[in-house]
Amino acid sequence: MDDFSSISLLSLSMLIGCYVAGTIPLAVNFSEEKLKLVTVLGAGLLCGTALAVIIPEGVHALYEEMLEGVHNHGHGQVEAEVSEQKVAEGVVRPSGEHGHGHEQLHAYIGISLVLGFVFMLLVDQIGSAHMHSSDDPEAARAASSKITTTLGLVVHAAADGVALGAAASTSQTSVQLIVFVAIMLHKAPAAFGLVSFLMHAGLERNRIRKHLLVFALAAPVLAMVTYVGLSQSSKEALSDVNATGVAMLFSAGTFLYVATVHVLPEVGGMGGHSHSPGGSAGKGLSKLEVGALVLGCLIPLVLSIGHQH
């Protein structure tokens, strides 16, 4: 019951923290110029979070689970398993098994990231295919962008929830706390970034709050469902396939898609950027906005460095 109460507490904290962070742009009245700056900062936070927090944490979770698995087994059992695999694979060198494990993990990293990215790409295409039937293609594109951004972050948050539920099922408090801190480090900035992006896109405040609530609920609900729904045998199987790390890396792929394909182009287009050679509108972002974008990218990096120490 101890594990259940801890996952409940973590889920509740995640819900409240995420929702409060998301209401900051709504609570403060920004001018047009300041709203643009906040949106750019939010875009930077999304990108920095994906690159500096989620991917490293996912990779760390993968390798940590492998190393713990090696240390936790009895030495005789490990030697027997290794020798059996060596006979099966024809590996002579003692380092062969170690290298094989690392190759397998490298494959996990790439596959998880790419699947997350491709999943969001397909969701985006399906969503935009439904939208293109509208008479006004520009309005349809904008609506599709809002929905995809929210949906992408909700899918990402759901994957986070699965990661936390899988971490809780390992019964290791340190793993639970690391995953929780990693998720909160990027969920709060992501909520801020999502709300500022939706405000810039011109959504009504009531609808923005609904989007935010869905985003805030996704991770806690999925964490509880994952934890409660897993039988002991499933938990053991999940720990064998490094579920926590894989789920985090999959969510990083969805996050990268949302940040790079939707939010950044929207932000870049705000300054009337033009790629035409003689285009006088090719201003792009102002120096202040570029500074805000870079700052947004660096904040998660600084937070993650502080968290590691």
Swiss-Prot record:
> What is a single molecular function from GO for this protein?
zinc efflux transmembrane transporter activity
Could you tell me which InterPro entries the record lists for this protein?
A: ZIP (IPR003689), ZIP9 (IPR045891)
State the organism of origin: Danio rerio
Give the phenotype of cells or organisms lacking this gene: Homozygous Knockout females fish for SLC39A9 show significant reductions in fecundity, embryo viability, and growth of their offspring. Furthermore, a high proportion of eggs fail to undergo normal chorion elevation during activation.
UniProt subcellular location = Cell membrane; Cytoplasm, Perinuclear region; Golgi apparatus, trans-Golgi network membrane; Mitochondrion
Recorded GO CC terms: mitochondrial membrane; mitochondrion; nucleus; perinuclear region of cytoplasm; plasma membrane; trans-Golgi network
Lineage, top-rank taxon, reads: Eukaryota
Q: Does the keyword Calcium apply?
A: no
Q: What is this protein called?
A: Zinc transporter ZIP9
Instruction: Note the topology in the membrane.
Output: Multi-pass membrane protein
